[in-house]
């Protein structure tokens, strides 16, 4: 049960497939991409968007959000039952940006959810195509991970803002299924569990009765998902303890926070997938490319090749730097918010800077922002090399890390040493080794103490030239170790607010 996530490949999770071979997986992922692309083309027609407007990432985000909201059954039911003033539960919409007389104008559109569902199903051969919806959720999640630092959320659950490298997927909706669970970081799972336990502490009936049984099985399922992400026996044993607790409370919260901290050095396996905005898939399908026939993978060269040949535009605020906006979106496209910046710079072929040094806010434009001063520019999403995405945490070693983020969660399977600030991390592990989990705690601390600075992760793995589609000649990068490795360094990234 523990390693339920590791039994099937990530593409199989992506497409709900039973064991398929590589060709079948590539075809079913391709089919999913085709569906998103066809839907996007149809929406651009409905909205009468020009080619340029259809390639605007802000329009893409609105269209993606509309279809996700149209299929959000729980929220739709909730809205039906709790009508709020000025909100039609049957409609969905958002800002669409058009170029009128040399200026960008914002237009608020509203559609029947039923109509959007019809267009989506039609684009997906009559299916609900849940995999495609999840794919868009993961793209939004990756964009949030790159744009915002979840300091407040971490502090609220009693964790430390420096643990932000564990927070991948923290904004994914609950309904994102197995593919969503695969990309969630250790910290995200721990945070969900802590929130659950806190509710149980405050609400006598949380674990009781018919609902309580459902709650309990959700709790155990989440514990198992988290257990499956850990790579050492002691960490997994600790998760068994948390899962089997009769009445989860503060002791379990302590254990969870302990295990999250330990994951800064004994990293868990977290999947990484390159999920691109719908406005990349649409034009590719429109140009006659058949993803299902050609096959597609989210963890290989395909997304890199697709981005090499795509034009995507973005609105730019008056004091934003288009190159910085490009970096933000590039990192989101490759699910690389918590990867080592030196490696990212090498793959991208241009310097990748920490979040706090970027002159750019998020990609979305708020409804109260002034459109008169809005410009648009091309996003540079191309890369110099490509590399295979990883779903392992790599093994560990140590290196000077920053005041903000004190560890990384690797995205690419490429040889390097993984930076983490051992003294800072170990300082958090003073004293408390009593209680039921004392032997596991002692064992985990011993392993962390033993993590060696000179150890190399992903030994022998390298990046590849874009012409090397079969990954035959790995190029092992060499790094300037004096450079800063963490993205959320000392940071002044905005907070993510729902």
UniProtKB/Swiss-Prot annotation:
Motif (Bipartite nuclear localization signal): 198-216
Region (Disordered): 1-21
Pfam families: Flu_NP
Molecular function terms from GO: RNA binding; structural molecule activity
InterPro entries: Flu_NP
Motif (Unconventional nuclear localization signal): 1-18
GO process annotations (BP): symbiont entry into host cell; viral penetration into host nucleus
UniProtKB keywords: Capsid protein, Helical capsid protein, Host nucleus, Host-virus interaction, Ribonucleoprotein, RNA-binding, Viral nucleoprotein, Viral penetration into host nucleus, Virion, Virus entry into host cell
PTM field: Late in virus-infected cells, may be cleaved from a 56-kDa protein to a 53-kDa protein by a cellular caspase. This cleavage might be a marker for the onset of apoptosis in infected cells or have a specific function in virus host interaction.
Ranges annotated as biased composition (Basic and acidic residues): 8-21
Family: Belongs to the influenza viruses nucleoprotein family.
Assembly notes: Homomultimerizes to form the nucleocapsid. May bind host exportin-1/XPO1. Binds to viral genomic RNA. Protein-RNA contacts are mediated by a combination of electrostatic interactions between positively charged residues and the phosphate backbone and planar interactions between aromatic side chains and bases.
Function as written in the Swiss-Prot or TrEMBL entry: Encapsidates the negative strand viral RNA, protecting it from nucleases. The encapsidated genomic RNA is termed the ribonucleoprotein (RNP) and serves as template for transcription and replication. The RNP needs to be localized in the host nucleus to start an infectious cycle, but is too large to diffuse through the nuclear pore complex. NP comprises at least 2 nuclear localization signals that are responsible for the active RNP import into the nucleus through cellular importin alpha/beta pathway.
Name of the protein described by the UniProt record: Nucleoprotein
Lineage: Viruses, Riboviria, Orthornavirae, Negarnaviricota, Polyploviricotina
